[in-house]
Amino acid sequence: MVNEEKYTYGINHEDIKTDDNSVIVLCEDEKEAGIINDRKEKGLIGVCKYQPAYQLLGSITRQIPDRTQRVEDITRYIGVYGFNSTLRVTLAMVIAAAYSKKGRTLFINLDEFSGIEHIMMSDGCSNLSDVFYMFKQAGEHFTQQIRECIKANELFDYIPAVVCADDISYVNDRLISGLLDELAHNLKYDYIVVNISEGINKPWSIMGRCSNVYISDSGDYIENCRFNNLKRYFIESGKEAIVDRMMRINLKMKDTMDEGFLKRIMYTDAYGYVSSLLDMV
């Protein structure tokens, strides 16, 4: 964002281009802004600077969609949440496998104690703890080092879970959202499936970013009450949109869980059931 005089006389235009090749010029009046906009030069937007802040921001956002909207046009975030962590991570793996048949999928596990390190193998050198550290060190930007932390199985890509619970409990929701956006923007996944732990700060902030939120359901009475409390919180705090995107799933898991689970996941009753539900979404 630059003022009109500096844009016209004082700078090399290439030096101020942003990642999406856009420049906002603050003009003295609407006439000058109109002249700039009439050129229809890609990435160049003129706005009058003499207006209330909320109107100024509105003028900009109407013409340049924000980064989150652009990313989500390409990548859909799929959230998995629940009050039984074992059921939740199982459902998350099944969801990731099902979405992998729809497009390129990345699985991110935000559990403090994942329990699936032998199912989704790591090379022992890099995991989500390292990714958070690299992301912060790089000023919250994607790097080649982060790319090298991503592993793959026959179905989807994944980042091995943290090895230290503090690496999840201390990270804030803004950092997680920023990491998701950078992964989506740079790697162009169709879907990023996120196992949303209760251990992270403000899990509903991550849910709010998701196109769909699947809730694991064991059928337990207290768990059902907790789910109702969660819905009430969303409604009373103005987050009804999250409720509209939520779906509870009771896997009624009959399949054996062991190190070879992912190799046979497509032949399990759980996968068949979830796939049939996704076909209706």
Regions inferred by a protein language model and the residue ranges of each:
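Walker A/P-loop phosphate-binding motif and the immediately C-terminal alpha-helix
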Residues: I74-I116
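NTP-binding/hydrolysis catalytic cores, primarily Walker-type P-loop NTPases
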Residues: L262-V281
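Conserved catalytic-core segment of NTP-binding enzymes
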Residues: S177-T268
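Phosphate-binding loop that captures ATP/GTP phosphates
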Residues: K102-Y158
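Short, well-ordered secondary-structure micro-motifs within conserved domains or adaptor modules
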Residues: M1-I35, S211-I215
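Short, well-ordered alpha-helix to beta-strand connector turns
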Residues: Y7, D20-S22, K42-G43, K102-G103, ...
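Cytosolic-facing regulatory segments adjacent to core modules
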Residues: A138-A152, P160-I196
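Extreme N-terminal, non-catalytic leader segments
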Residues: S22-Y77
